[in-house]
Amino acid sequence: MKRILAIVVAVLLLSGCSGGVKIEADESTFLIGLRNNCDCEIYKVHHEYYIGDKPIGGGYACNADGSAIRSGDVLVKDFICADFPEGADLSEFHIEVFVVDGSGKEYPCGEVLSLDAAYGNVYEIIITGNYEGGFSSAWSES
């Protein structure tokens, strides 16, 4: 329940309900914002993450009411120490992203993304595209 509350608060803060408050990760967490810049309605973002080539975990980010994720909205995934094996080398972190339509069908968003991750940092993935032309994901330049 504590993690769900943290995710909801982070989503609200990053989506503009923050009143100007900046999102920060504490020293035992890093955050990845998943920004929807797609040209169509998507309902969930599925992610799978790895250390090197080893699958570690995954999950879904979506609106609590099941509604479409609006263009420009940011959903946040927090990563804590317990999400990784002891001694995991976060410089070998990789994440794969998929969008999910209203019927539950998943669409890949390009290649697996690499990140030299570190606790205490906030990162953002920009998701673009549509069902006809395909989707892509890339790290934000900012």
Model-derived regions: residue spans:
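C-terminal motif of bacterial Sec signal peptides marking the signal peptidase cleavage site
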Residues: 13-16
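Positively charged n-region of N-terminal signal peptides that target proteins for export
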Residues: 1-4
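Short acidic, flexible loop segments centered on an aromatic residue
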Residues: 37-55
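Tryptophan-paired
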Residues: 52-89
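Bacterial signal peptide processing site
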Residues: 18-21
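Asparagine-centered strand-capping/turn motif at beta-strand->loop junctions
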Residues: 23, 32-39
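A short, solvent-exposed beta-strand micro-motif common in secreted/extracellular proteins
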Residues: 88-102
